């Protein structure tokens, strides 16, 4: 008699997408980040749900309610620290997942890649509106500066900003709607994750060689499920250690002050995971140009599949392209550093050069090197 997991209508879906899923034998630890992102999403939704039970989305009470959660709610400090630092780990896994996709040519699964970009945008929006909720100084001014960038759009910009704010400045209406967005968008992201899965399982996973592995696959369970469990351990251990021993490592000291519209912080900056995009925004002196560059820094990923010129899918045997991609990684790290620094020389020039290099590598150098490597193969 067939097993229940193979015959039950619901369990069969779970079985086909996890337990008996045909998986390439040679996938490395770089393929662990998908499951780690799933873990991060579940952890963020659960901790966020408990925080929402005690949080008050009102400008007069938001700051105090966060302090109340940390001081008076049973294990509230731990839930809050896990949620705040969980976002950092979430983005770290996201960027490594994207980097793996770029290195091994996973972007050629266009459906999977495009739903992944949509997920990235949704999670970025969620993180941004979530950063505003504690109503600290950097929360308030970060929200004011970033949302006011929409005013750069011709004709509709000012109306759009006022519509988003719910008034003429970041105020109570803004905080209330940002809380609603922060609560709701992760559930939309969960639905998009299902789409991401759907597209991925339509084509099957890529592997380090970039070659078809249809003739050489094994079930996901037990081999890779145990490997994923080890990944969970290796993620949860440093996250818990950070939340317990150094919870404010990635936070901003200004957020220990209640939001004050009358006092501007000396240096306004977002969380570390947005700094590379913030540096690209600041590299353009023109406001509208900066906004377009900010959008392009993320949306440029959508054109990567169309710029693939190499006969080989993976970079595993393409040393020149490897060097180019590692240069891109270093460029992103430089942009992250520049984004967190004050806007002054020579840092401004370094940021502009790094921004130019970022787009040049993705749009020109990688496709050119693919063509050159094709010629070398001939």
Swiss-Prot record:
It comes from the Eukaryota. Its main location: mitochondrion. Heme b b566 binds at residues 97, 196. CDD domains: cytochrome_b_C, Cytochrome_b_N. It is found in: Mitochondrion inner membrane. The chain crosses the membrane at residues 33-53, 77-98, 113-133, 178-198, 226-246, 288-308, 320-340, 347-367. GO terms for molecular function: metal ion binding; ubiquinol-cytochrome-c reductase activity. Its cofactor is heme b. One of its GO terms (biological process) is mitochondrial electron transport, ubiquinol to cytochrome c. It is a multi-pass membrane protein. One of its GO terms (cellular component) is mitochondrial inner membrane. A ubiquinone binds at residue 201. The keyword Membrane applies. It holds the Pfam family Cytochrome_B. Heme b b562 binds at residues 83, 182. Binds 2 heme b groups non-covalently. Keywords: Electron transport, Heme, Iron, Membrane, Metal-binding, Mitochondrion, Mitochondrion inner membrane, Respiratory chain, Transmembrane, Transmembrane helix, Transport, Ubiquinone. Component of the ubiquinol-cytochrome c reductase complex (complex III or cytochrome b-c1 complex) that is part of the mitochondrial respiratory chain. The b-c1 complex mediates electron transfer from ubiquinol to cytochrome c. Contributes to the generation of a proton gradient across the mitochondrial membrane that is then used for ATP synthesis. The cytochrome bc1 complex contains 3 respiratory subunits (MT-CYB, CYC1 and UQCRFS1), 2 core proteins (UQCRC1 and UQCRC2) and probably 6 low-molecular weight proteins. Belongs to the cytochrome b family. PANTHER family: CYTOCHROME B (PTHR19271:SF16). Heme 1 (or BL or b562) is low-potential and absorbs at about 562 nm, and heme 2 (or BH or b566) is high-potential and absorbs at about 566 nm. This is Cytochrome b.
């Amino acid at each position: 008699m067939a097993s229940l997991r193979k015959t039950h209508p619901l369990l069969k879906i779970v079985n086909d997408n996890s337990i008996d899923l045909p998986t390439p034998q040679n996938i490395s630890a770089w393929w662990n980040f998908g499951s780690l992102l799933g873990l991060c999403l579940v952890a963020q939704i659960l901790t966020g749900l408990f925080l929402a039970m005690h949080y008050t989305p009102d400008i007069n009470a938001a700051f105090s309610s966060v302090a109340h959660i940390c001081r008076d709610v049973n294990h509230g400090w731990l839930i809050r620290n896990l949620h705040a630092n969980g976002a950092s780990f979430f983005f770290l896994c996201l960027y490594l997942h994207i980097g793996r996709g770029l290195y091994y040519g996973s972007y050629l699964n266009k459906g999977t890649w495009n739903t992944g970009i949509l997920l990235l945008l949704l999670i970025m929006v969620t993180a941004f509106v979530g950063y505003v909720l504690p109503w600290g100084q950097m929360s308030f001014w970060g929200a004011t500066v970033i949302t006011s960038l929409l005013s750069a759009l011709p004709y509709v910009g000012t109306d759009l900003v006022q519509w988003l704010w719910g008034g003429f400045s970041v105020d109570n209406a803004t905080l209330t709607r940002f809380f609603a967005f922060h609560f709701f968008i992760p559930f939309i992201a969960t639905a998009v994750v299902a789409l991401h899965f759907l597209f991925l399982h339509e084509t099957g996973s890529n592997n380090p060689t970039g070659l078809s592995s249809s003739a050489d696959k094994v079930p996901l369970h037990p081999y890779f499920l145990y490997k994923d469990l080890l990944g969970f351990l290796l993620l949860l251990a440093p996250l818990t250690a950070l939340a317990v021993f150094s919870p404010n490592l990635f936070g901003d000291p200004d957020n220990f002050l209640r939001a004050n519209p009358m006092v501007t912080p000396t240096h306004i900056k977002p969380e570390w995971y947005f700094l590379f995009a913030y540096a690209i925004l600041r590299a353009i002196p023109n406001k509208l140009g900066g906004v377009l560059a900010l959008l392009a820094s993320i949306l440029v990923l959508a054109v990567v599949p169309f710029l693939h010129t190499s006969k080989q899918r993976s970079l595993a045997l393409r040393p020149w392209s490897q060097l180019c991609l590692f240069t891109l990684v270093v460029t992103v790290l430089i942009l992250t550093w520049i984004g967190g620094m004050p806007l002054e020389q020579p840092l401004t020039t370094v940021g502009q050069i790094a921004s130019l290099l970022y787009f040049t590598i993705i749009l020109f150098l990688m496709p050119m090197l693919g063509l050159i490597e094709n010629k070398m193969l001939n």
